[in-house]
Amino acid sequence: MELKMHNVQETENLKFDAEVGKVLNIVIHSLYTNKDIFLRELISNASDACDKLRYESQLNPNLLDLSDELKITISSNKDKNELYITDNGIGMNRQDLIDNLGTIASSGTQKFLDAIKNSKDSSQTVELIGKFGVGFYSSFMVASEVIVESRKAGEEESWIWQSKGDGEYSISKSDNQVPRGTKITLIMHPEENEFLDKFRVENIVTTYSDHINFPVEFIDEEGKSEKLNSKAAIWTKPKNDVTQEEHNDFFRSVAHVGGEPWMILHNKNEGAIEYTNLLYVPSIKPFDLFHPDRRCSVKLYVNKVFITEDNVQIIPQYLRFLKGIVDSPDLPLNISRETLQNNRVVEQIRKSLTKRAISELGKKAKENLEEYTKFWTNFGAVLKEGLCEAMPTDEREALLSICRFHSTGDEKLVSIDDYISRMKPEQEHIYYLTGNSLDSVKNSPQLEGFVSKGLEVLLFVDPVDDFWTSVIHEYKDQKIKSVTRADVDLEKFSSEEDKTDEENKSNEEKTEETILQYFTTVLGDSVKSVKISKKLTDSPVCLAVDEGAMDLRMERFLREQKQLNYRTPKVLEINTKHPLIKSIMKSYAESGENPTLEDMIHLLFYQACIVEGEEMDDVSLFAKRLNNLLGKISV
């Protein structure tokens, strides 16, 4: 239907409400960053109009014939450079046009919602999204002139609203035989003619309006109609009515990964804040999980109209493996619906979703460890990123409780609660060791004393472990301690046969003190100190750090990332029961200082550095000392 402007009655020229000219300029040039939004907004308004009519017809059945199909149609005329958006919803009369289009931020939809809220018939509900009163004016981003022709349901007269977005508009009565509803004609800027193309329109509709309640059709120049929105908003169904096949199809459309969802979170919250979430945990790890951008993949909808998936802080970064949607009429959007405001409502939804996700993952872990291990292999490292974030103790402990770790005490992954349940009565700490791989930590000299005394140690092999262990030092009143700490004391776990009588012990201490001084003198500034190890059983030496100092692996990581430009001296622990150390002690006691002993001591220090992945200051000197010793060996 073309609009014939000559077929109108007397035109009434009006000015927009106070300061609207300035506001229009903001809307057109600053408020929206994506021009596609204009069509989303017009379709949303059309959907609102259809919703209004459906509601009003329940009170007045004469407004809507049962055979009527409420829908939205889009068409274009490339010769005239015009785009048309038509709906057969409630329509507007003269006063509606003035109130709703002549006043910015005084949306008819909001007024309608207020009327519903104040209605005594509280059982009736309606889904309306145009709460901001400015979406219509985004049309002027792409159009030089906007013409609205409308007839309100139940009324005979039709009206034409017309404006060029310059602070004025006109209203006139139309003599055209206008069907119920509203038709918007956009006279496009020449450079915006891409929006006249059917495929461009279809892309916008499927992106933003694929799930609205009413069909959106495109009518081509030959009069052929094609429905553009096709997907049902399955999250609006009761969760028990959604089939696995529907879940699989929707999951693939939002997750862009293969396979089926490993876990489904489908919930409707009807408390102080209303929202529905349909979130999936993939069974396959996405390729971009650790991309520097680390984008979340949860789409935000308001009453089934897509708003954005960018800058959505509706889930924390450490749950970014979740794919799906959150839909809420209560989500606080800025006036352009493009950027979420950081306020209390968003934070409450975020907290609720986070708590629910952690709770459901915890249930999965208890139900089937084998299945949970698959999840943990894919996403455990991401989940542990959350342990580095600032959060209340109870939330952090809830997150830590669903983490799983390798351990010296079990071939299967264990929880930290499993570990605590197996602690020895006299044990005061949860012990752990970090490393680059499971094999490397299992073979670490740091574990020898713990294994020999039956003490379980948790094995951390993800890079993120270095970070969270630097900020979390306690879990459920149990201290968490690295086995690389120099103050680790395992003597209280010794058996009776391991204890030495006081006389022998006194003699050993004198000998040990002498050798410690010699090691310290030889190594000089290369070490912070030299101590007798209380944890080594098979290896001669190892590196350690004092309590409160940076962990070995964390310091190395920061140096690699150029965040630290120096190396702190470490503690060297020596095992006085090892044959090599005994040989040095004996030789020193018999003949005192000599170059061969010094080479041996330096090589033992180099060995400890190599095992921990520490760089040597002078590789050439290491090779020289090694060659000196090898040259004295008789073959």
Curated annotation (Swiss-Prot):
Region feature A, mapped onto this chain: 1-337
Keywords in alphabetical order: ATP-binding, Chaperone, Cytoplasm, Nucleotide-binding, Stress response
SS bonds (residue pairs): none
Localization, UniProt: Cytoplasm
Domain of life, per lineage: Bacteria
GO terms assigned for molecular function: ATP binding; ATP hydrolysis activity; ATP-dependent protein folding chaperone; unfolded protein binding
B: annotated segments: 338-556
Cited Gene3D superfamilies: 3.30.230.80, 3.40.50.11260, Heat shock protein 90, C-terminal domain, Histidine kinase-like ATPase, C-terminal domain
Principal location: cytoplasm
One GO CC term, this protein: cytoplasm
Region (C): 557-635
CDD domains listed in its UniProt record: HATPase_Hsp90-like (cd16927)
InterPro entries the UniProt entry points to: HATPase_C_sf, Heat_shock_protein_90_CS, HSP90_C, Hsp90_fam, Hsp90_N, Ribosomal_Su5_D2-typ_SF
Function: Molecular chaperone. Has ATPase activity.
Family, as annotated: Belongs to the heat shock protein 90 family.
Subunit structure and binding partners: Homodimer.
Protein name as annotated: Chaperone protein HtpG
